[in-house]
Each structure stands twice: as structure tokens, then as C-alpha cells.
């Protein structure tokens, strides 16, 4: 149905072992074999998955999605925690993450950050915008 409307669907890499890597997402993309089903990796979820014993390096995992990534989801995390981590306070090397995605042709990005009731939410939005843009060339 989505293909009839030209809509692309992307599997977001999850917080759970079921589909927390590009490699796992690609299994379904290859099974379905539709140009309308692709991968939407979440940087934070990928990073935490890469910390599991025997896991691939996060940047090698991203490479496995070459040609099948519709956009990249930029989110900060710390080991074992996936939500409400402010940009720049966790484990993500955003420069390397962005460069890796750009190197395989990904040019669409989403930034995920959290409102947790803070009064200075507008400043948080401005900071997130500035922080993420600072990791892209020519912006």
C-alpha cells in the first residue's frame, strides 16, 4: 500500500535486541526486497548495541546499510540508557557518526532530544540545533 503512494518505510533500529543494529534491520530489507522498505538507524541505539559482547563496531554496522538508509536519527546515549541524555554529555562521537553516514550517501538527518518539564526548553532547542549543526561540514 505504501508503495502505491510512493511512501518509503524505514525500520528504526530499536532499543531491544530484536532489531538494534543495521545488520539485523537489513535481514528484513533483504527478505522483503522492496525499494520502499529501508533502514532508519538511531545513533544512540546503535552505539549501545555495539557495546554488547561480540557486537560489531558501530561504524562497520552502519556500512552494512549502504544504499538502504533513508535517513539517520541522531540521539545521545550513555551505556545502557537510551532516553533523556542531553547532547554532548554521553558517548556518541557525533562528528564521526555524521561523517560515517555522509560517506555512504546519507543526507537526511533527524535530531532527537527530550523535553522533561524544564522551563528553559527554548534554550535547549537552540542548543540542540547549534550542537548538531556544528558536526556537519559546510553548515
What are these regions (language model features)?
Residues 15-17:
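Short, internal active-site loops enriched in acidic
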Residues 19-139:
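Histidine-acidic metal/acid-base catalytic patches
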Residues 1-5:
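An active-site-proximal structural segment forming one wall of the substrate-binding cleft
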Residues 8:
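Residue-level detector of anion-binding/catalytic polar loops
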Amino acid at each position: 500500500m505504501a508503495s502505491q503512494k510512493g511512501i518509503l518505510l524505514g525500520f528504526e533500529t530499536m532499543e531491544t535486541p530484536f532489531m538494534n543494529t543495521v545488520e539485523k534491520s537489513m535481514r528484513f530489507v533483504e527478505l522483503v526486497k522492496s525499494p520502499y522498505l529501508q533502514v532508519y538507524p538511531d545513533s544512540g541505539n546503535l552505539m549501545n548495541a555495539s557495546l554488547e559482547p561480540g557486537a560489531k563496531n558501530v561504524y562497520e554496522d552502519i556500512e552494512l546499510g549502504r544504499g538502504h538508509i533513508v535517513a539517520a536519527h541522531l540521539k545521545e546515549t550513555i551505556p545502557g540508557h537510551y532516553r533523556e541524555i542531553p547532547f554532548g554529555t554521553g558517548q556518541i562521537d557525533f562528528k564521526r557518526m555524521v561523517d560515517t553516514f555522509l560517506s555512504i550517501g546519507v543526507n537526511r538527518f533527524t535530531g532527537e532530544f527530550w523535553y522533561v518539564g524544564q522551563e528553559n526548553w527554548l534554550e535547549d532547542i537552540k542548543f540542540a540545533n547549534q550542537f548538531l549543526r556544528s558536526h556537519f561540514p559546510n553548515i
